[in-house]
């Protein structure tokens, strides 16, 4: 994974490119919708508008999240990305509901389409552009772990699926004269958008509610610490996903007869062992003598 400065630069670049592509696609799709009258193209254009708004939210969230810790936010600003992702999910869900209602109305009152050849070529070009953007965002997410870019990527994965559905609907309507294919395609797209919004919201809430890392990750932390020389035990492991980094705290047990300096060195080694697992991590080890009887978080957590 890249260092914090490179991560921040890469996230900003990805959000800027996404915003530029989204603005271009919504303009082209709106023009095609006006020319054809296709409700599925309207759905795709509206999804593009959500993409523009979402990319703006993402850009703002990424910029704020990239700020270093300050006096008022000593844990940093990483949760801004999760907030941006949650806002995106709300925008996507709202668009899905509105377009779903319009699609159902068109099912009962079909409307003739025009210039479908133009619409087909516009959708093919839009699909290629969205697929290229998804490829770039996938790379950025793998390198940085950005929640906001991942949420933005989910929008454009949806956009690819939306465009394919629109393409199928227009082809069926033009070549097989299925006059409800356009409305059915739009309704299917709306349902997919709503499902995608649900997943985005749940993922954002995991960070906002300070959910623990997976048990497998906690077991890796425990194994890494227990593998350090001088460590006799570990308990009260506490973790949370902060968006651009993870936060890990634990109590490490050492021989009670050693010096404070020696115990401090063991604590540092255990922290470094965890940082080796999570390069973008804040790790705090509390050193205490082995066998001490005290109140433990492990005993309170059910």
Task: Name every feature range the model reports, one short phrase each.
Residues 2-23, 28, 34-302:
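Alpha-helical transmembrane segments and adjacent TM-loop junctions that form the membrane-embedded core
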């Amino acid at each position: 994974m890249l260092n914090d400065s490179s991560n921040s630069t890469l996230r900003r670049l990805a959000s800027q490119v996404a915003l530029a592509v989204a603005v271009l696609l919504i303009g082209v799709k709106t023009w095609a919708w006006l020319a054809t009258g296709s409700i599925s193209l309207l759905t795709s254009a509206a999804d593009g508008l959500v993409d523009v708004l979402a990319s703006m939210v993402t850009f703002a969230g990424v910029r704020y999240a990239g700020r270093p810790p300050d006096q008022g936010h000593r844990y940093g600003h990483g949760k801004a990305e999760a907030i941006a992702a949650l806002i995106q999910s709300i925008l996507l869900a709202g668009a899905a509901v509105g377009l779903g209602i319009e699609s159902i109305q068109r099912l009962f009152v079909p409307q003739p389409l025009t210039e479908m050849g133009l619409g087909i070529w516009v959708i093919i070009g839009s699909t290629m552009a969205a697929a290229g953007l998804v490829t770039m965002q996938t790379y950025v997410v793998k390198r940085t772990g950005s929640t906001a870019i991942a949420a933005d990527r989910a929008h454009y994965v949806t956009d690819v699926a939306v465009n394919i559905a629109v393409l199928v609907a227009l082809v069926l309507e033009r070549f097989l004269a299925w006059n409800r294919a356009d409305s059915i395609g739009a309704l299917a797209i709306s349902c997919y958008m709503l499902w995608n919004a649900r997943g985005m919201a749940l993922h954002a809430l995991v960070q906002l509610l300070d959910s623990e890392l997976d048990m497998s990750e906690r077991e890796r932390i425990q194994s890494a610490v227990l593998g350090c020389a001088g460590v006799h035990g570990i308990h009260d492991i506490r973790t949370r996903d902060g968006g651009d980094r993870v936060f890990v705290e634990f109590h490490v047990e050492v021989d009670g007869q050693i010096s404070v300096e020696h115990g401090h060195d063991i604590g540092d080694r255990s922290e470094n062992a965890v940082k080796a697992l999570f390069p973008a991590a804040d790790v705090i080890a509390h050193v205490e003598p082995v066998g001490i009887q005290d109140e433990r978080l492990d005993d309170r957590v059910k």
